[in-house]
Amino acid sequence: MRADMTLPWWAWAMMAAGLAVFIAMLAISIRRHGGIRRPLFASPYALWMILFTVLPVILIGYYAFTDASGAFTLDNFRSFWDSNFESNKVILDAMGEAGAAYVSRGTVNVDTLGYSLWMAFECTLICLALGYPAALFMADREMKLGPTLVVLFIIPMWMNFLLRTIAWMSLLEDSGLINMLLKALGFQGVQLMYNSGAVLLGMVYNFLPFMVFPIYTVLSKMDFRLSEAAADLGCNSLQTLYKVTVPLSLPGVISGITMVFMPSVTTFFIPRVLGGGNTMMFGDLIESKFLTEGNWNVGSALSLIMMLLILVSLSILRKADPNGEGGGIA
């Protein structure tokens, strides 16, 4: 844990300014609505956002651009592409031969980010390939199975995310259910754990509902008379799907892609449990900087880089779905 938690005067001033802005906004809202009742209901949310979103971002920004003594520096960002930088030695030493390979290429953080982006891309693509047909089936009014399937998708989400991930170990490990069945059928056991495939499986399992529900929300609100009109004009089912249904459901698709891609890039528990430490994603890297090394400065710099990626993803969502019709988990 970081020993020096002393903040400069300007950091305290920025936090005080944020609190002052909150009080001013509350006062203006009370004056505008002619009473305190409505603004009072909104004030807990505004205060929560300031305390747990705005102020943490200010602190991360402070640590990202300072060293341990509080002096301004850009070395924290330099460590992102320089594996020989001092702050990377702890992780590289723990990785052994793999760490030595990163040193020879000088790209431990860049490679980790690239691997995370690739895994997130694969996860998003698989979730889209599985989620769109599922959402289409759920929204089919003739089948009348939509509410039942929604419940079936929601029930696993009632269980803790960590427990759902750990549960896969009992299926994939060498003495797990799958290998037991293979051996009972006369086949040799296979290595299903501690590789990228297991990590990808865990990611798809956990994030698939975040792809299904936005698409289902949009499809369930779609006027299906448009599909009937397309059929009357001579379109077959496949043509109706690509010319009518898919274009109208794009807001949900974009929303689902964003909701799956962002947590996929930042996840760190799934690679640790199902990857067994053989795979490292960007979330693992940030977590190790904060908790293992206690290096809040470099960890904050890496967090800012991740925030930038998230902002880019959100901007793409905003551009593709300007009216916010993508839906969500309702």
What residue spans do the PLM features occupy?
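Transmembrane-helix boundary motif in ABC transporter permease subunits
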Residues: 20-34, 121-154, 227, 319
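N-terminal signal-anchor/first transmembrane alpha helix
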Residues: 2-62, 137, 147-151
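C-terminal transmembrane helix and the adjacent membrane-cytosol boundary/short C-terminal tail
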Residues: 20-36, 216-231, 297-330
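Transmembrane alpha-helices
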Residues: 44-53, 151, 155, 205, ...
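Interhelical loop and adjacent transmembrane-helix boundary motif
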Residues: 2-10, 71-88, 268, 272-322
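Short membrane-interfacial helix/loop motifs at transmembrane-helix boundaries
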Residues: 47-109, 171-175, 276, 328-330
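Membrane-interfacial helix termini and adjacent extracytoplasmic/periplasmic loops
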Residues: 3-7, 31, 74, 93, ...
